[in-house]
From Swiss-Prot:
Listed PANTHER family: D-TAGATOSE-1,6-BISPHOSPHATE ALDOLASE SUBUNIT KBAZ, N-ACETYLGALACTOSAMINE PERMEASE II COMPONENT-RELATED
Gene Ontology biological process terms from the UniProt entry: carbohydrate metabolic process; D-tagatose 6-phosphate catabolic process; phosphoenolpyruvate-dependent sugar phosphotransferase system
Protein name (database record): D-tagatose-1,6-bisphosphate aldolase subunit KbaZ
Gene Ontology CC, one term: plasma membrane
Domain of life per record: Bacteria
Pathway where it operates: Carbohydrate metabolism; D-tagatose 6-phosphate degradation; D-glyceraldehyde 3-phosphate and glycerone phosphate from D-tagatose 6-phosphate: step 2/2
Family from the record: Belongs to the GatZ/KbaZ family. KbaZ subfamily.
Subunit structure: Forms a complex with KbaY.
Amino acid sequence: MKHLTEMVRQHKAGKTNGIYAVCSAHPLVLEAAIRYASANQTPLLIEATSNQVDQFGGYTGMTPADFRGFVCQLADSLNFPQDALILGGDHLGPNRWQNLPAAQAMANADDLIKSYVAAGFKKIHLDCSMSCQDDPIPLTDDIVAERAARLAKVAEETCREHFGEADLEYVIGTEVPVPGGAHETLSELAVTTPDAARATLEAHRHAFEKQGLNAIWPRIIALVVQPGVEFDHTNVIDYQPAKAAALSQMVENYETLIFEAHSTDYQTPQSLRQLVIDHFAILKVGPALTFALREALFSLAAIEEELVPAKACSGLRQVLENVMLDRPEYWQSHYHGDGNARRLARGYSYSDRVRYYWPDSQIDDAFAHLIRNLADSPIPLPLISQYLPLQYVKVRSGELQPTPRELIINHIQDILAQYHTACEGQ
């Protein structure tokens, strides 16, 4: 199952192709992605982050083995072949344990890597860029690379132990700012310089040599860089190819390497395509998919209010708001301003902190109630036209069933389609 190295080989041969990575644990987002990949007969890359999934459960409550089981069960139920499914681990390193001394944090990171590799994750992003409690800020390239090489050695040994061979594919480096969208309002963004990218690569090459890992260098398929794309709560910094031209040209000197771009959410279809052409050929997308999920659910909640007596409504939006106010830990440090500004951000921000709340039992019950209310009888076409106009066109042409679930899935797939088109190549 060498989908990624084959993709890189084709890209380096001039095909201008790429692959997108679905970074979400939401069942409806994953179903939308699996069904879309199945319909288009493409492999599907699904990634878990070190915050979502770790050996202790992460914020989803899932270990890597749990996450793999969950995704594979869903794929099986949708008749998606498991050999077309690639699982990746994102920002694997001491990220979750920055408040601990480095020795302790890295011991946890060793176990994190073991748990991901043993569970069958094949794309491993080694990211040791964050300073721990007793570290200098920022870390030098050499320290970052030494720690990454240590984790690579653990990964290789674990893979051989569990699967008889080491067939992992690695991504190294990190982007600025932190994953998941910027905390503050953005105006300008520094593109990674070619010198910084080269320094990261050379530091890692040297550190891998010291660990006796020369042979795995061709399996280091991508370097994470900042090509100048980001989003905050209400704005998107669009890709400007001219600003990334020197960086784009620099990677052409490396035979088996492309770039991986994070925070590509909300870029225009044209920008996504240009990113892939410019060798930022692994596109990460997460918040934009749960943002589309939220859009569809808010639209269905508005339709519900038109059709169902108030006392029988799910009250999804109010339940969501109440839970977010009761448990503000996932948005409080991100959303600023007066009460109204924070209220708007909770519901509508591009950074989509609401995605952390969908698993809550009260919210999940309200979601199920909403779906039941709208599944009992056909949704009137004029209301679909009003609240989900893109889906209305497909319903009218006969290509989409106007059930609540299908409307949600299709709205998410509209975003996936942009990524698929960007990655198709010539």
